[in-house]
Each structure stands twice: as structure tokens, then as C-alpha cells.
């Protein structure tokens, strides 16, 4: 089976709505072992939608559409799918009863145009939609071709696909694709590719690196007759990759760096406080995203001025005069000072020049010092980021969290 994912809606073409449906469907179809070779977007125009059906069926046997099932005149998906397969539309009385019940239960007024959502070909396989007013449908044409019609809103589309389309499609495939994602930080995509370059030509499982935001992901994908067989193919490849990348791998799947660090802090009962200058509270804010962090996060201070650094953190005036606020010495005193004043086992500091102004030949834009004080032992790292202001701040925050992760993993 080969499929094309087709989003229908002018609002997507214009960029008013981000098409997250395509990402969801692509992943789910891959898990079923169904190849997706094309994705397309077409506006609310009859001629262009029919043309899109024609073009899609030149390369696939299954089209999965999202959108265009609403009650308005420009919702055309099912009418045009029916026309394409020479099927006649008719009122499905059972759908009308369900729709009337939906409006009554939600104390809403049902207008005449809502009945449009109850018209389908009599041959259509109806896909119930308990989360909205627009049912989906599967239309099966000649030569093993089919169009699967799904609503546009993700909260309606995703459960409909999972509960009804997956069982339907499973009948047409005898294999599954299983992927495992390893999340990497501390080495760039090119460096990581060098470390695993000989593995990238492997066919089953396949190995593919992707840069995503600031971290990098490595996807291992295997095809098997079932999930268990595919996972057995992945296991030795994962073991080899972990051997090569070591602690640069911080997690699996959709886990974030902040979740990994937050869990380590809570599990190890390591209290923490932050003193930030150039990051302006980003480290504290990111840590606070983790549920339960209140058990260990005590305090976050944004000490932007020299006066605040001296008054709040105890940074010495001589340190600022001799070395400046952006210096190893200042970062060290900031980390020690916040840990002492907040009474925490860990103190984190950041100080740097985020730009666009303020840089010198000796201290250019992108120069950052970060301090990490753990149980009285303080270390400082120096970073040089060549990026705009926001990226300098974000990269500082991510590198500090990754540094903290590595240090926490050493603690029993």
C-alpha cells in the first residue's frame, strides 16, 4: 500500500494554520508499514481538488485527506471524493439523528446547513466523530483505490484515525515499521554523523540523524512482520550507537533535556538555585517547566547589574573592577553566592554578552561564562556562540542544563 497525505483548505495554503496533521499521519502510517511518498496541500477549489486526486493516484492507491468536512459551501472534500468515484450523495438518516443528539446534549442550536454533514454516498464507510459534528468516511473506488476523509481539527482527526482508520488499514499490510529515537546534545549533527557514518548505509534497520532545534536526534527504524521482530532488529544497532556516542545521549523518544534534568534533581534530592545575567531567568524558567520541581528548586535571581551581583550574590567589587562582569571569576562568585544565600546544594550562574552590542575584541558578542557550584565545589565553563541575541541566550541555557545533567549523573 502507498499513501498520499492531502490537506484541504485555503487557510493552510495561506499559512494561517500550521498543518500538524501531516506530521501525525506520517508517523502513524510509518508505524503501520505504509509508505508515504507525497504530501500535498490544496485550496478550497473544486477543479484543483479533483486535479489533486488525479495526480495523487498516479503514485499511490490511498489518499488520506484532512479538512473540508464542515457545513459551509467551501467544505468540498466528500462531495468531490464522491464525484471522483461516480458515487451519489444521499442523506444518511442515522447520522442526522446522531447530529441532532449532539446539539441537544451541548445546548447548541442546529442550523439547516449542519445537515450537510450528514450527506455521504451510500457506499461510504462512516467514521464516527464523538469529538465534533463532522463524521469522516472511507470511499472505496475501482482498482483498489480509496479516499479516506478525515476532519481538520487535530482533536477530532487523531482519535478518529487511531480508533477507526488504523484497524481498517491494518488489513492491507503484513509488516510494521518501528522507530526508536535517541536524543543527543553536546555534539553537532556533522560530528555525530562522523561517529556513526558507517551505520548510515544500513538498510534494516536504517539510521538517520536530524538536527532539531539545538539538540540532534538519531532515528533507528526497522521493518518486521510485527513489533517484536522490529524491536529485535533495533536492539543491537542501538547498543552500538550508545557505545559510540556515550553520555552525549541524554534521552529517548519525545523526552526533553529539561525533563531529564528535572527528574535527576528530584530523584537525587539535589536542591538548586540560579543566578542569571545574560539569560535573564531562562535557566530557572526552563527548570520550572518540570512538574514536581518545587521539591528542589529554591530560588532564581536575575542579577543583571553589577550592583545586584554585589548586593544579592556577594560578588566582590574588586572582581568586577579587575576582571569585569563577563569573566570566569565573576561567574564563579555568582554560583557560589547564590548557593550560599539560598542554602542549596547546587548554584548555577550565567554571565555573558548576548549582543547585538556590547562586544569588544577581547570580549566579543557571544562570549558567555557559566558557573556550577555543587556541594561547595565550583567549576566554570567558557562558551563562544556565534549567533543572534536570542540564540546566544537559548544556547547558554541548553548548555548549562546539559552540563548539570552530566554532573548529576555522576552523583550516586
Curated annotation (Swiss-Prot):
What is the protein named?
Putative competence-damage inducible protein
The record ties this protein, via Pfam families, to: CinA, CinA_KH, MoCF_biosynth
- Family to which this protein belongs: Belongs to the CinA family.
Which organism was this protein described from? Clostridium perfringens (strain 13 / Type A)
Instruction: Classify the source by domain of life.
Output: Bacteria
Which SMART domains does the entry mention?
A: MoCF_biosynth
Amino acid at each position: 500500500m502507498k499513501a498520499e497525505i492531502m490537506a484541504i483548505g485555503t487557510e493552510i495554503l495561506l499559512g494561517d494554520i500550521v498543518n500538524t496533521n501531516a506530521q501525525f499521519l506520517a508517523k502513524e502510517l510509518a508505524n503501520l508499514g505504509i509508505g508515504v511518498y507525497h504530501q500535498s496541500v490544496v485550496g478550497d477549489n473544486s477543479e484543483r481538488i479533483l486535479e489533486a486526486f488525479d495526480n495523487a493516484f498516479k503514485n499511490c492507491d490511498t489518499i488520506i485527506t484532512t479538512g473540508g468536512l464542515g457545513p459551509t459551501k467551501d467544505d468540498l472534500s466528500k462531495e468531490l471524493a464522491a464525484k471522483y468515484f461516480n458515487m451519489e450523495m444521499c442523506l444518511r438518516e442515522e447520522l442526522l439523528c446522531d447530529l441532532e443528539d449532539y446539539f441537544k446534549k451541548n445546548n447548541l442550536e442546529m442550523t439547516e446547513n449542519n445537515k450537510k454533514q450528514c450527506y455521504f454516498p451510500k457506499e461510504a464507510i462512516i467514521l464516527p466523530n464523538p469529538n465534533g459534528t463532522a463524521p469522516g468516511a472511507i470511499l472505496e473506488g475501482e482498482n483498489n483505490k480509496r479516499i479516506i476523509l478525515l476532519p481538520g481539527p487535530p482533536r477530532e482527526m487523531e482519535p478518529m484515525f487511531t480508533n477507526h482508520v488504523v484497524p481498517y488499514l491494518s488489513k492491507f499490510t503484513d509488516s510494521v515499521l518501528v522507530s526508536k529515537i535517541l536524543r543527543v546534545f553536546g555534539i553537532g549533527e556533522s560530528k555525530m554523523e562522523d561517529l556513526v557514518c558507517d551505520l548510515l548505509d544500513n538498510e534494516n534497520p536504517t539510521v538517520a540523524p536530524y538536527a532539531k532545534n539545538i539538540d540532534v536526534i538519531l532515528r533507528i527504524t526497522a521493518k518486521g512482520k510485527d513489533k517484536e521482530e522490529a524491536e529485535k532488529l533495533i536492539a543491537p544497532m542501538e547498543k552500538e550507537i550508545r557505545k559510540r556516542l556515550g553520555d552525549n545521549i541524554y534521552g529517548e523518544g519525545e523526552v526533553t533535556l529539561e525533563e531529564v534534568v528535572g527528574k535527576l534533581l528530584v530523584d537525587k534530592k539535589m536542591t538548586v538555585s540560579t543566578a542569571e545575567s545574560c539569560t535573564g531567568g531562562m535557566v530557572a524558567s526552563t527548570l520550572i517547566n518540570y512538574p514536581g520541581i518545587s521539591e528542589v528548586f529554591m530560588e532564581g535571581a536575575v542579577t543583571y547589574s553589577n550592583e545586584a551581583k554585589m548586593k544579592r550574590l556577594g560578588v566582590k567589587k574588586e572582581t568586577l573592577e579587575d576582571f569585569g562582569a563577563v569573566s570566569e571569576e565573576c561567574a564563579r562568585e555568582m554560583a557560589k553566592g547564590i548557593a550560599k544565600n539560598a542554602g542549596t546544594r547546587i548554584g548555577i550562574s550565567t554571565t555573558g554578552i548576548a549582543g547585538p552590542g556590547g562586544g569588544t575584541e577581547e570580549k566579543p558578542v557571544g562570549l558567555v561564562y557559566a558557573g556550577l557550584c555543587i556541594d561547595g565545589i565550583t567549576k566554570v565553563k567558557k562558551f563562544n556562540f556565534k549567533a543572534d541575541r536570542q540564540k546566544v541566550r537559548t544556547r547558554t541555557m541548553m548548555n548549562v542544563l546539559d552540563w548539570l545533567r552530566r554532573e548529576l549523573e555522576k552523583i550516586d
